[in-house]
Amino acid sequence: MKKSNKLLDNKKLSFYNSVNNHILVLFGLISITCVFSDFYYKTSNLTIPFIITTLVSSIITFIGIPKLKKIKIKQIIRDEGPKNHFLKQGTPTMGGIFFIPIGIIVSNILYFNQENYNIILTLSFVIIFFMFIGFIDDFLSLKKKLNTGLSSNQKILLQSLISLIFILICASNNLIPQNIQIANKVFNIGNLIYPLGIFVLLAESNSTNLTDGLDGLLSGCSVLIFTGLAISILIENPSNNSTLAPLCIAMAGACMGFLFLNKYPAKLFMGDSGSLAIGASLGGIALISNHLWSLLIMGGILAAESISVIIQVSIFKISKRVKGKGHKLFLMTPLHHHFELKGNNESLIVSSFWLITLFLVIINLIFLIKS
């Protein structure tokens, strides 16, 4: 019995070490990318914001965990979720309030009163307010002692309102180009870009919200996507977008610092305050930099998570109406839960989704370089 327990402990230790190794590899990969970018592009300034935000984010998050435990800010696990998730019950949540502001503050300090600083301010507005919507949702969830805080309609209404204000600010300052670049073609859609912009912010923030279901999944994917966006911006227009690229990498660093404590087994969850803000920042940056196509490619995992839910609900409703009994295509959605119920290890799923995201980022960058 002692021998079997020792063997089990050794397996757990080996597994824990492999998770740490993956995160160190990710940190090293992004750091090298930043250094190379700063060397290659004269206007690039990625290394310093990335290192600063990673360090500060990890320190602030580490300090914040005991504070959350003290005031009993703990995750509520939904009853219909995978059974192994009940082991996560009581893990502190609302981590977004610690790491999201770090990326914003560092960006504002580095580029205060510089050219295009109004872009940083405008994006800071939408990110902070989406974080605040998430905070309200997290708070109400804890108050009700349920996994749901705001209703779907309430959340969509608040997101739509903030998105509309953001779009109006962008329109009055000509921050969003009225054309969309897809592959090598440019489509001028005029004022249609504004309703599209609202849709992008809603779709992206809800996709990131759905993706945040496994330890380190969203934070790790976000590090890669933010970095990919930064490099994409520099490739397309290194001289005019030197403000947006460091903002991307500052957000990547903030997510990276959080990931050190969000890795399996997570010591802290980001909550809706983190996931909604990440989605808003990705969507907002992609809109202003005209990289919606790049975001769609690099955020393939985010899109897949969201689409899996839409397909599942649609098939269930249609089959129930036609046959009188609802049928499911997936064991459970979002998509990561389907793979969980298939018997796959949580960290294996997370690492695989990171790898797919890395592959999609590389594909996008190759495409941009060749075009």
Swiss-Prot record:
It is found in: Cell inner membrane. The keyword Protein transport does not apply. GO terms for biological process: cell division; cell wall organization; peptidoglycan biosynthetic process; regulation of cell shape. One of its GO terms (cellular component) is plasma membrane. It comes from the Bacteria. It catalyses: UDP-N-acetyl-alpha-D-muramoyl-L-alanyl-gamma-D-glutamyl-meso-2,6-diaminopimeloyl-D-alanyl-D-alanine + di-trans,octa-cis-undecaprenyl phosphate = di-trans,octa-cis-undecaprenyl diphospho-N-acetyl-alpha-D-muramoyl-L-alanyl-D-glutamyl-meso-2,6-diaminopimeloyl-D-alanyl-D-alanine + UMP. InterPro entries: Glycosyl_transferase_4, PNAcMuramoyl-5peptid_Trfase, PNAcMuramoyl-5peptid_Trfase_CS. It is a multi-pass membrane protein. Pathway: Cell wall biogenesis; peptidoglycan biosynthesis. The chain crosses the membrane at residues 21-41, 46-66, 92-112, 119-139, 156-176, 182-202, 216-236, 241-261, 268-288, 296-316, 349-369. Keywords: Cell cycle, Cell division, Cell inner membrane, Cell membrane, Cell shape, Cell wall biogenesis/degradation, Magnesium, Membrane, Metal-binding, Peptidoglycan synthesis, Transferase, Transmembrane, Transmembrane helix. Its EC number is 2.7.8.13. Its cofactor is Mg(2+). It holds the Pfam family Glycos_transf_4. One of its GO terms (molecular function) is metal ion binding. The keyword Cell wall biogenesis/degradation applies. HAMAP family: MraY (MF_00038). Catalyzes the initial step of the lipid cycle reactions in the biosynthesis of the cell wall peptidoglycan: transfers peptidoglycan precursor phospho-MurNAc-pentapeptide from UDP-MurNAc-pentapeptide onto the lipid carrier undecaprenyl phosphate, yielding undecaprenyl-pyrophosphoryl-MurNAc-pentapeptide, known as lipid I. Belongs to the glycosyltransferase 4 family. MraY subfamily. This is Phospho-N-acetylmuramoyl-pentapeptide-transferase. It comes from Prochlorococcus marinus (strain NATL2A). The gene is mraY.
